[in-house]
Amino acid sequence: MKILVTGVNGQLGHDVMNELAKWNMEAVGCGTSPVYKGIRNGSPVESMPYEQLDITDRNQVFEVIRRVHPDAVIHCAAWTAVDAAEEPENIPKVRAVNVDGTKYIAEACKAIDAKMLYISTDYVFNGEGTAPWEPDCRDFAPLNVYGQSKLDGELAVSSILQKFFIVRIAWVFGINGNNFVKTMLKVGKTHSTLRVVDDQIGTPTYTFDLARLLVDMVQTDKYGYYHATNEGGYISWYDFACEIFKQTGYDTQVIPVTTEEYGLSKAKRPYNSRLDKIKLLKRGFNL
């Protein structure tokens, strides 16, 4: 089986490529840079086949996908800077990547009868209540530009393809790229106290584990919508920060605050990022 992976310079795409290498599967990575520019740690992705690809260029998307001719595309590339997405000058760029780029990939997959696995987010929901969001729930109500763009990407994939997986994830962290864990480790070195919100609830998800799931999933025909997070229950960002400092031995004091008290974000965040993963388990997948 041959897999094309978008966004391999990011934290999830990086780990997906390395997981594919473990399976000895034929894989081609792509990103906007001329060559791979992710973290250099001696992992397989550094020497695996790579294609420069601007997913906002429809002609280029079709040219690359037709030439590589994969059996499946794992689409990890996305605009993920949630606050920057709110800037008026950035909105067209966000939608070009997350909506148009996703649509072009879906159309190209259809043209060669390839599967597509699209990475989405809990941000397609409004975060109200406390019940975990189910994968087949259609009560979409994004609170921000990023969430709306990812939802529109979902709708593009599901309207164009029949052979698709839409996997919503939340609170992702990994070795490559920027994430909450790295931010806490950096800030913890220079601050004796730190304010972290305690009223947004979700589940941290390690890209290493997520990559293993995605590679397993894409080899099946169990198409549909899924929610994928690590085990361990639901926690707040405050809880997560406390555990990070506990594990690393930092003595940084973490002060719990509400989202309103924190008040620094341009984009609204959902309070309830709990994702129900029972469907994932019922279909024989593990994370």
What role is predicted for each listed range?
Residues 213, 220-266, 271-272:
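Mid/C-terminal beta-alpha module of Rossmann-like enzyme folds, strongest
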Residues 268-287:
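C-terminal amphipathic/interface module of NAD(P)-dependent oxidoreductases
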Residues 43-58:
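Rossmann-fold cofactor-recognition segment
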Residues 55-97:
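NAD(P)H-binding glycine-rich loop region in Rossmannoid oxidoreductase-like domains
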Residues 92-104, 124-167, 172:
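Catalytic helix-loop patch of NAD(P)-dependent Rossmann-fold dehydrogenases
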Residues 155-202, 208-209, 216:
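NAD(P)-dependent short-chain dehydrogenase/reductase
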Residues 1-23:
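N-terminal Rossmann NAD(P)H-binding glycine-rich loop of SDR-like oxidoreductase domains
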Residues 29-40, 55, 77-78:
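N-terminal Rossmann-fold cofactor-binding loop
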